[in-house]
From Swiss-Prot:
Broad enzyme group: ligase
Keywords: ATP-binding, Ligase, Metal-binding, Nucleotide-binding, Queuosine biosynthesis, Zinc
CDD domains, per the entry: QueC-like
One annotated GO biological process: queuosine biosynthetic process
Reaction catalyzed: 7-carboxy-7-deazaguanine + NH4(+) + ATP = 7-cyano-7-deazaguanine + ADP + phosphate + H2O + H(+)
InterPro entries to which the protein is assigned, alphabetical: QueC, Rossmann-like_a/b/a_fold
Residues where ATP binds: F8, S9, G10, G11, Q12, D13, S14, T15, T16, C17, L18
This protein's name: 7-cyano-7-deazaguanine synthase
Free-text comment on the cofactor: Binds 1 zinc ion per subunit.
Gene that this sequence comes from: queC
Length: 227
């Protein structure tokens, strides 16, 4: 029996990964991390989606210690989300160590469950300047987890080389475009669905959707060539 753990935030990318996993694995477990993020709606959205999609289990882990250590627009209400990069070249929504922590804990959970895969929706094509969304980082994390736990564990990144239009096409391939469009939360301002329309996450999401809707056949062909 094939088993997977999906790192699940309730956003567009992780929901698309979860839907794909439900079609590819016999048993799928979702794990959501409460790190004191800007909007608690993210946790509620993930819980509702996990229930509606009938995952085998959904675990919400309290990792609010990350909030104490990582200063970011996503962990501090007093820091407004900016469309400009900081002096270090990173967006101010970058939470240092977040994916290191999430993948480590998801890997431990996978070990407990006997799951062979941890699935995450990180993407280098549209990685928004986050260093912990790069393929090189994922490969390094997989190596560290396998060595540290002395067992094979695959970090699966279905979206790594997809642009946002192709990610929308992937949701549509599983007949879930409307669900992802209307019920996920990607917005940095905590608005489900189309979001605020002005934050970086909403702008990237909307552009990808428009690009897909403008050329469905072409984008789907690009997706099929990559998958």
């Amino acid at each position: 029996m094939s088993k997977a753990v999906v790192v699940f935030s309730g956003g567009q990318d992780s929901t698309t990964c979860l839907i794909q996993a439900l079609n590819q694995y016999d048993e799928v477990h979702a794990v959501t991390f409460d790190y004191g993020q800007r909007h608690s709606e993210e946790i509620a959205t993930a819980a509702k989606l996990a229930k509606d999609l009938k995952v085998d289990s959904h675990k919400i882990l309290d990792v609010t210690v990350l909030n104490e250590l990582a200063i970011s627009a996503l962990t501090r209400d007093a820091i407004p989300v900016s469309n400009e990069l900081m002096d270090n070249g990173l967006p101010n929504t970058f939470v240092p160590g977040r994916n290191i922590l999430f993948l480590t804990l998801a890997g431990i959970y996978a070990y407990q469950l006997g799951a062979e895969s941890v699935i995450t929706g990180v993407c280098e094509t549209d990685f928004s300047g986050y260093p912990d969304c790069r393929d090189s980082f994922i490969k390094a994390m997989q190596s560290a987890l396998e060595q540290g736990m002395d067992r094979e564990l695959k970090l699966v990144t279905p979206l790594m080389w997809l642009n946002k239009a192709q990610t929308w096409a992937l949701a549509d391939k599983y007949h879930s475009l409307e669900l992802v469009r209307d019920q996920t939360l990607t917005c940095y301002n905590g608005i489900v669905g189309s979001g605020c329309g002005t934050c970086p996450a909403c702008l990237l999401r909307a552009k990808g959707l428009n690009d897909y809707l403008d050329d469905k056949a072409g984008v789907m062909a690009e997706l099929d060539a990559k998958c």
